[in-house]
């Protein structure tokens, strides 16, 4: 999921 990938990139 794109949303998850973006979130992971921002939070990690």
UniProtKB/Swiss-Prot annotation:
The modification Methionine amide is found at residue 12. It comes from the Eukaryota. Expressed by the skin glands. Keywords: Amidation, Amphibian defense peptide, Secreted. One of its GO terms (biological process) is defense response. The keyword rRNA processing does not apply. One of its GO terms (cellular component) is extracellular region. It is found in: Secreted. The keyword Secreted applies. Belongs to the bombesin/neuromedin-B/ranatensin family. This is [Asn3,Lys6,Phe13]3-14-bombesin. It comes from Pelophylax ridibundus.
């Amino acid at each position: 999921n794109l949303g998850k990938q973006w979130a992971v990139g921002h939070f990690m």
